[in-house]
Amino acid sequence: MLDRLQAVEDRYEKLNELLSDPAVINDSNKLREYSKEQSDIQETVEVYREYKDVREQLQDAKAMLEDKLDAEMREMVKEEVSDLEVQEKELSDRLKILLVPKDPNDDKNVIVEIRGAAGGDEAALFAGDLYRMYSRYAEMQGWKTDIIEASYTELGGYKEIIFMINGKGAYAKLKFENGAHRVQRVPETESGGRIHTSTATVAVLPEAEEVEIDIHEKDIRVDTFASSGPGGQSVNTTMSAVRLTHLPTGVVVSCQDEKSQIKNKEKAMKVLRARIYDKFRQEAQAEYDQNRKQAVGTGDRSERIRTYNFPQNRVTDHRIGLTIQKLDQILQGKLDDFINALVMEDQAKKMEAAE
């Protein structure tokens, strides 16, 4: 591990030199690339330097115990050794986590797609519950939520809702939400009091930047139509809604949330770019690791990852076997217990694979 850490520190110093080079300063692409690389390893280098400093202090303290010391001084040095050993262990554990390969998408904004699946109107209502849950979680993180496209039902649910969450690290925390979410509750329309089971699917896509994926205008078909609101009524007599079709991949995106056709096209383009990027990313991952299934789930849209049981006020995440009896609070956006546990599980698996 120490050899790897020293190599990281050496690279950090080299990047300092490169970022001072006039040729790099005048090349915006290189400047962005090297700045990001340095930013990505800065915390590792800082913790490694602190770790080296603590190790040196520990060695000096242990060397003092070899000298002739009076009882009081020896006790003080022993206490210092004990404290430094604790610090060394804590820093070593942090470094192991920092050396785990990072997902290059972790810092990105996300596009979230929620669709009512099995269960009809009840599934659509649950899709609305999930949208509000993620919106409140985003608000707690200081992130911004922006609806891109929504298809309403007469009861106030969503057949489909697509929205963007803007915030640093959004993908790192929300990527584990990919999959099928199951709800068990008595619908308001159920007179017999029977519990129904419905599902909604969640897809979390990292926002793709223009430099990451090249989409040509000639490959996109643009269709316009009048937008509609809940219940299907027309809310705009102008042709402001936009549908984009990427001809090479067949990916289709529509947006009608804005009154302006230009703004709808801009929003739709963001979703189109993210979906195409996600398609290529998943294909590359499948080729790289076709048979391996991560403990946190494959991200398959049909995979049941979590159950929300209303009568018992509990939520169970089936991937990590975690059950929490606070469904009401979780639907208010208090997702940290699940998200932190999933992040830790993911890190543990990656550390195990790296050893």
Curated annotation (Swiss-Prot):
InterPro entries, per this entry? PCRF, Pep_chain_release_fac_I, Pep_chain_release_fac_I_sf, Prokaryotic/Mito_RF, RF-1
How does the record describe the protein's post-translational processing?
Answer: Methylated by PrmC. Methylation increases the termination efficiency of RF1.
SUPFAM superfamilies this protein is in? Release factor
Q: What keywords does the record list, in alphabetical order?
A: Cytoplasm, Methylation, Protein biosynthesis
Query: One GO CC term of this entry?
Result: cytoplasm
Any idea which residues bear N5-methylglutamine here? Answer: 233
Q: Which SMART domains match?
A: PCRF
State the Gene Ontology terms under molecular function: translation release factor activity, codon specific
Q: Where in the cell is it found?
A: Cytoplasm
Going by the entry's taxonomy, the superkingdom of the source organism is recorded as Bacteria
HAMAP family linked: Rel_fac_1
Q: Which family does it belong to?
A: Belongs to the prokaryotic/mitochondrial release factor family.
NCBIfam families documented for this protein: prfA, PRK00591.1
Describe the task this protein carries out. Peptide chain release factor 1 directs the termination of translation in response to the peptide chain termination codons UAG and UAA.
Q: What is this protein called?
A: Peptide chain release factor 1
Q: Which gene encodes it?
A: prfA
